[in-house]
Amino acid sequence: MAVENKDARPGKALKKESQPLIIAKTPAEEQRLKLERLMRNPDKAAPIPEKPKEWNPRAPPEFVRDVMGSSAGAGSGEFHVYRHLRRREYQRQDFLERLSEKQKLDEEYKEKLIENQKAAEDRTAKRRKKREKLKQKKLMAKKAKMESQKEEDSEKSSSSSASEGEEKDDDAEVPSFIMGKR
């Protein structure tokens, strides 16, 4: 189904219906409006901003022809050049110090992670060993119980065979009463 132009001119592009201007008063409302706009057309790719580049100072010049000092007279252009070079060098040194401090903290963090992981593995191994020891103890107790039961059964069977001979003698006797009758 084709959308009709209001002007009915073939070369004229369609205008979108104007939406009321909504001004967000709070950050939450602003975020809600952005989400609503994104969800109107879910097939369209959402703009994801890339991480901004980290600031790097300009590399120091490899060769400086005429080195100027701070003794340049006030009002001369040389003093301003010296001052800017000095400021840039201080910035570079501060950046390198911060970078080395960050690397040092990262290394300490990684070492601490490894140390904590090793301690956790040691605790786990110790507990595992304790569990295995308890399990072995239970198995040994169970085996000992089974063996003692077997010994008792064998003693009963040997005593029952001896008592069977006695029972045969008892069987010869006639019972004086009959069970189950009143």
Swiss-Prot record:
> What is the predominant subcellular site recorded for this chain?
nucleus
Q: Which GO terms describe its biological process?
A: mRNA processing; RNA splicing
- Region Required for nuclear localization, residue ranges: 126-138
Q: Where do the coiled-coil regions begin and end?
A: 99-157
Recorded superkingdom? Eukaryota
Q: Where would you find this protein in the cell?
A: Nucleus; Nucleus, Nucleolus
Composition bias (Basic residues) maps to 125-143
InterPro entries in alphabetical order:
Prkrip1
Q: Where is the composition biased (Basic and acidic residues)?
A: 1-18, 27-43, 114-124, 144-156
Query: Which portions of the sequence form the region Required for RNA-binding?
Result: 51-143
Bias kind Acidic residues: ranges: 164-173
* GO MF term set: double-stranded RNA binding; protein kinase binding; protein kinase inhibitor activity
UniProt keyword list:
Coiled coil, mRNA processing, mRNA splicing, Nucleus, Spliceosome
Function of the protein: Required for pre-mRNA splicing as component of the spliceosome. Binds double-stranded RNA.
> What's this protein's family per the entry?
Belongs to the PRKRIP1 family.
What is the name listed in the Swiss-Prot or TrEMBL entry for this protein?
PRKR-interacting protein 1 homolog
Q: Which organism is it from?
A: Danio rerio
**Taxonomic classification:** Eukaryota, Metazoa, Chordata, Craniata, Vertebrata
Q: Which gene encodes it?
A: prkrip1
